[in-house]
Amino acid sequence: MIPGTDAYDIAIEISDADIERLLSVMPEDVEAASALSYCRNVFLPLTTACRYTCTYCTYYDPPGQAELMDREEIRETCRRGADAGCTEALFTFGDDPDDRYTAVHDQLAEWGHDSIHEYLREACEIALEEGLLPHANPGDQTREQMAHVADLNASMGVMLETTTEVQAHGGPRAKNPGQRLNTLRVAGELGVPFTTGILVGIGEDWHHRAESLLAIREMHERYGHIQEVIIQPVVENERWQGGSPDLATMRRVTAMARAALPEEVSVQVPPNLAPARDLTDCGIDDLGGVSPVTVDHINPEYEWPALQELTAVAEAAEVPLSERLPVYDHFVDDGWLSAPIEAAIEADNDAGDRFRSILDRGVNPVTL
């Protein structure tokens, strides 16, 4: 049984036979995608406060050091992103900052907000005003928290990471796989197009990798809301010196993801963290969000590739490369979007023209 599922009343039955079948998949068993896509974004770390202290993560700052982005910085970053042709405002923060972060909560109160999710809603409003579509990844969320911001997001996300307990999540506030799965379920119940994924190399074994992918598949089969699954290797940084998975591991687990998931769910590898050129024959069809404006605030030591580098990956694979929105096309076509997001895409302005050009033709009118 997946740890924590009882506490959240999540019934997921994954048979040993299904796991064994998936474990038998190798790269030569899957087909390469016929095209690759990517999304142009700006990365906005709303706060670096987090109740977790994962040993592989450099994103969080301890109490007394964590900060909040102010409204002016959010607006200016979004404006720069729109000028650079970005379509996505990627908002992140550490999972719901706990009571240790007194300065963060005091600042939120001074700005007129009772919670970080209230501030996230205002940040999403700013992004829409500046011509970007919000995609929020605020970690674990309750139904109430997600419902408070879902209508102002084109899509949302949280990494499942793994279905097992690992030492890298250790400590008094360890991540709970059941709680992560509950967030995926809440997104499905609320009809939110959703991004999730697994972390490779944090202490899980092959059984857990297969189980994690099959758990994601089961959630998608119930609600149809998973738009992409990220296969992300853990990478070395100032807090993690435990090594990264080798190429053979990444090729095998990527192929397993492609085999486990239905065709409409994209398989993505982050091109600043994974050897994308060596994984195109393993079933990936997306290269994730990259930014011409901001750094990867979760992995700041690993620079985003330039568009020319993504083009080179596609050319090496002999497939076309196209740009996409932060919500995948079929969710737009099938009526998953909220009224504010639909209005932004249909707007008679530069942002609306940019969104529709990408949606209709995969081409951004703003060149880099």
UniProtKB/Swiss-Prot annotation:
Pathway: Cofactor biosynthesis; coenzyme F0 biosynthesis. InterPro entries: Aldolase_TIM, CofG_family, Elp3/MiaA/NifB-like_rSAM, F420, rSAM. GO terms for molecular function: 4 iron, 4 sulfur cluster binding; 7,8-didemethyl-8-hydroxy-5-deazariboflavin synthase activity; iron ion binding; transferase activity, transferring alkyl or aryl (other than methyl) groups. It holds the Pfam family Radical_SAM. Its cofactor is [4Fe-4S] cluster. Its EC number is 4.3.1.32. Residues 36-272 form the Radical SAM core domain. CDD domains: Radical_SAM. [4Fe-4S] cluster binds at C50, C54, C57. Consists of two subunits, CofG and CofH. Catalyzes the radical-mediated synthesis of 7,8-didemethyl-8-hydroxy-5-deazariboflavin from 5-amino-5-(4-hydroxybenzyl)-6-(D-ribitylimino)-5,6-dihydrouracil. This is 7,8-didemethyl-8-hydroxy-5-deazariboflavin synthase. It comes from Haloarcula marismortui (strain ATCC 43049 / DSM 3752 / JCM 8966 / VKM B-1809).
